[in-house]
């Protein structure tokens, strides 16, 4: 037995370790938010420490059952696989998870609860472990059948999960593409809008500089600003491109990592859910059985308690009645004692109250007299002496009255004491009568209680006889019938519980699936919203930087002018302040002289007042202090005399220099005052000594009188209290002896009755316990039989589940390691190729930027007439070619989408077939026991590469001409017409265009196709244009000429049909010498990269021209795609008549939009001119001159004319808004039809 038990104990420990390791492998379904590189470096150490604590140590290896590894080599191979899998799993957990998740804490809490419950269950299950081992050995042949069924169900579940996974992946890919398109469009719209704003600000700065500053200064500043802007734009373009490439690579890597994590987490969650379900089911059955046992025990205990409680209540009621009588007697005696105490206290309290009232009156009168003396003693010294004498007489009279009142109170007190003693004597005489009455009442109550108790006992005996007969009848006939009915109900209830458990389990699984799907969708949405918020924050920060730079530049110039004006004004103001200060100084010097004389006179007067005040304060201090502080008063008086003498000597010397006559008068007055004060002090000292002697004598007499009275009262009170205490003790002793005798008699009777009742109850209890034990034994036998069957089923299921989890763990570890190794090699190749591509692209970008800069410098020297001609010719050709390329691109996109969808379906079917075949081979090897090694999966070929054709020099030369205007902002409003002039009449520009068209374009890697995710759906509707315009120089934003009143549009490139994804100008066959800097999205092939081209389109112009209302009713915006304008489209061609109609309609729309934009720009220029004229008038009115009146009148007239022109232009714009809306709707309808 001991050896078998040790083997079983070791097996249980191994199974627990396997559970721990499996649960830690596949725990935690939540996905952590990705950290940035900086935060990852900081959190790596803390995350590794936390994971080391949570994960099991490497010394405790997982003990798998050796089903297929019977030999030594197989075991070594299995151990090696486990170690490698555990190593890479730990690395993956440390890289992905940085903290303890709520799911981990919840799982740990549930595990601890299960451990506690299992420990309690183990103590009761200990007895039946031997039978369980025998049953398990007998039922081993049944396991293989269950294994087969379990694997079939698991295989169907895996197929369903793979199908669901493929559907989810397709939906996520489609959603990601749509969001990437919207984010890229909104970003390009933001770039276009920002550039137009910057162009308007530069025009405003130029106008102000030309009107205020000198011409040469403005020319120099303009050149310097262009150089700085070009450098800043170049740096920002390179930086932005590198950041976008990094973000795209990171997003692709993160998607692959999330996909691998999803698969692992789903498998782990399925295993964990199955384990929890089995444990809960077993524990519910066991807890129900325990609950039934507890209920029966509680019922028996409640019956016994009721019997004891009833008996105790009967005896307690009798005892309580006797106790209440005794308490009433004690309470009556206590009330009598309280009344005596209250009488004595009341007498003393009235005496003390009268004395305190007298003291309070004396204190109040003293305070009133002192306050009166303080207020009047300065001017009425002699009257104060008379008042003091009168006050002493009045005090003597009041003391006499107090003595009389005290005698009266003492008489009252002695009268009350005498009266209370007489009352006590009367009470003592009547005490025997009271005791006789109380004894008679007590005996009568005892007789009544005895009669009632006898009647109650007779009734109780009769009831007990009836109850015994009824219990016998119940045990013979009703109890067996009730037991059979209860047994039937219990069985039916168990069946209902089983059915309800199955229903709840099915419902719980369904709800968990729904909750998991909803949670997963929310997590994906939350992640996408986070990325969108980050993109929006970056855009907002850049916009704020640009705004702050331009505002600072404007404010610096204004601040410089204001500083110059302020320096002149400050110099003039300083001179005026110096003059005013000199005048004020002269006046103040005169005033100071007069003030000094007044101060001297005021000081003399103040000294006299201070002397009087000091003498008065000294008198008050003498009056307030008593006999104990006389020495201190004399010292203070001597010190005050000395201080006053010194002050008087200083004051006399000072006044002797000024006026000698005043010194003599002051000395005589001081001597006279001293003599008067000495006489007053002598009289006051005599009076105070007499008053103090009288007060001492009166106080001694009063204290002696109080002591004698208190001693007499205490002697009388002691005598009375001792007599009362003696009487009470005698009464208490008699009552206690009587109660003692009664209690003994009651206890004897109660004990006899209790002994009889206890015998009867013990016999009944023995019978009931025997019946209950017999019934419990039968129930336990039935319950144990059912529990054994249920436990055997649970054990079989648990063993099957463990083996399935082991199979899953081995398969996942192998597949994860192979896939990780292949993905690592593919990533390294992709990184190297992307680095090379970025290097070549940077060289080509630099060359393109220099080429475009030279072209713009040449084009600035052309004239307005040639630019307009080139613009008209280019506009016609662009409209013709744009419509054809739009139609071609729509057909090509449809074909490429169908081809991509077919390829994805074929790949999904192939991967599903491979996964099913691999699972089947693994299952055969592990179930049938073959020692063959599993074949490795086919290597995953990396599908994303970056390659370039030709040598390095050819690539750099080919990339030098593709520079776009996306990374370079326009420096002046007239610089965008340069390309049109080159296209029209420059021979060297035509040669440059032919070289550009014949050059090959480099390909772009697939992982750089998708930009950062983000959503800005509402941005397209705020501008009122939907997605009607790709990025490029807008139709609605032609630029003004130098004259502000009649601007001419200089931009020859309309935006409605441009081919670049940023603000660039599309090349055509006729005007092809324009230089383009293409983005990396144009380097990809036409088949696989079509979705990325679609996502790179911007879509918000400001205004569109008028279109007929019949065409504006077609709904649904769709963006124009740039690939049709530069690539080769495959699809059907339209007829010549349809193309001509479409071109004519687009030309009309373009003309309406150009007219609307020119009127808008005229309005802006007029508003700027009006604001500058108002500013000039304000500056001129601050410092008016006689010659500036005529100029102000002329400027005022010009301002009125400009305001009239502004009103007219505003009305025209208001009238043109409806036609432009119709044009926008028409363009959207065309785009939807062609898309």
From Swiss-Prot:
GO terms for molecular function: phosphatase binding. The keyword Magnesium does not apply. Keywords: Cytoplasm, Cytoskeleton, Repeat. InterPro entries: CACF_protein. The keyword Repeat applies. HAT repeats lie at residues 131-163, 165-194, 263-295, 327-361, 392-424, 1141-1173. Residues 1010-1075 are annotated as: Disordered. Its main location: cytoplasm. One of its GO terms (cellular component) is centriole. CETN2-binding regions contains a conserved Trp residue in their C-terminal ends, which seems critical for interaction with CETN2. Interacts with CETN2 (via C-terminus). Plays a role in the dynamic structure of centrosome-associated contractile fibers via its interaction with CETN2. This is Protein SFI1 homolog. It comes from Callithrix jacchus. The gene is SFI1.
